[in-house]
Amino acid sequence: MMEKHGGKVTSDRRAGRRQHGQRCSASDAAPLVVVVILIVGALFLILGPTGSSSFTVPRIRVVFNEPVHVAVAAPPPPPPPAQMQAGANASSEEDSGLPPPRQLTDPPYSLGRTILGYDARRSAWLAAHPEFPARVAPAGRPRVLVVTGSAPARCPDPDGDHLLLRAFKNKVDYCRIHGLDVFYNTAFLDAEMSGFWAKLPLLRMLMVAHPEAELIWWVDSDAVFTDMLFEIPWERYAVHNLVLHGWEAKVFDEKSWIGVNTGSFLIRNCQWSLDLLDAWAPMGPRGPVRDRYGELFAEELSGRPPFEADDQSALIYLLVTQRQRWGDKVFIESSYDLNGFWEGIVDRYEELRRAGRDDGRWPFVTHFVGCKPCRRYADSYPAERCRRGMERAFNFADDQILKLYGFAHESLNTTAVRRVRNETGEPLDAGDEELGRLLHPTFRAARPT
């Protein structure tokens, strides 16, 4: 019984092996057929069909190490000779939407229609508007409009806009304490007068628009007031129309291109000044005109390199070559720093503060010439050196304001502040005449009736 059963089991197992072998043979044959089909198909595509079949397949040809020839468009024909120089000088400006620069063969540039009889018309306007006097309290000083500004676009360096903001805050502080009006410009009023020259059309426009302003005070954006208590000796310039920081000997004897500086100057609102602007401006249009005058200034002014014309060199050139016309009305100031060069100043602030004001020689204006705070790099000095110097100048000036309210910076190298005076409940200016004069200047007091 067991053998019978065992024989049946053995027979069943053999039958199972035969069936499994048949299945394996069938499954092994299937991949082989697929491989053969793929090989034949590939050969068919590569070698192409034979016979007279109308069906054609593109032939594939692989080539190595054969040079590739790319067709290059023919260059455009060269421009006419008269346009070549203009195109070379104007490409960057035209890309930014500006008109082509003025050429040497074009009519000279002008700020606009010549203004005649301005003094008489301004006097008539002032007489008709007594509520806007050209002289104001205290002591009947001239009404002054402080003018500054920066480019309309944001600075390439993100820190630049912050530095410009702090520089403007510094100017607002000084103007508020001394009762001066302030105008901040961020527009190019004339596309031809870019860079340093942008101030000329602006000054002319403000003179005509504000006849009540007796003096216009231009201050560069990178110039910082660093003696907030200093009052300009206005009466010293009563018979002069232009006040510049510099040295007469350097201008008229040496003909030095740095004999004066136009980073901070006063100009009177009168016919003489309008005529000066008209004589000054034709040397400033961007392009070949500015380049040509730059070469002329390099020949006529001592020590000047032959770069494009700048407004400072142009003004010195006018004073030197037309001294009889302009010289008598120009005051060149050297008794205080109307425009002090920053490099010899910024590291001495602590020393000056310890010495106090007894000698009266605190730098009035610290001008960061060559730093260009709006750019990622400086013209002549390491950017970090410039930024550190500006930080110290801002804080030195700001301490003089914060002191009015009982605070001061922890050091000139940081913006952190600390309290320096305990509050007593009395007015802040009690017992401090100088503090009271700044907190409550006389020009803000009501006039007696």
Curated annotation (Swiss-Prot):
Its EC number is 2.4.-.-. Residues 1-24, 74-109 are annotated as: Disordered. Residues 50-449 are lumenal. Pfam families: Glyco_transf_34. One of its GO terms (biological process) is xyloglucan biosynthetic process. Residues 1-14 have a biased composition (Basic and acidic residues). Glycans are attached at N89, N413, N422. The chain crosses the membrane at residues 29-49. Keywords: Glycoprotein, Glycosyltransferase, Golgi apparatus, Membrane, Signal-anchor, Transferase, Transmembrane, Transmembrane helix. It is found in: Golgi apparatus membrane. GO terms for cellular component: endosome; Golgi membrane; trans-Golgi network. Disulfide bonds: none annotated. It is a single-pass type II membrane protein. One of its GO terms (molecular function) is xyloglucan 6-xylosyltransferase activity. It comes from the Eukaryota. Residues 1-28 are cytoplasmic. Its main location: Golgi. Probable glycosyltransferase that may be involved in the biosynthesis of xyloglucan. Belongs to the glycosyltransferase 34 family. This is Probable glycosyltransferase 5. It comes from Oryza sativa subsp. indica.
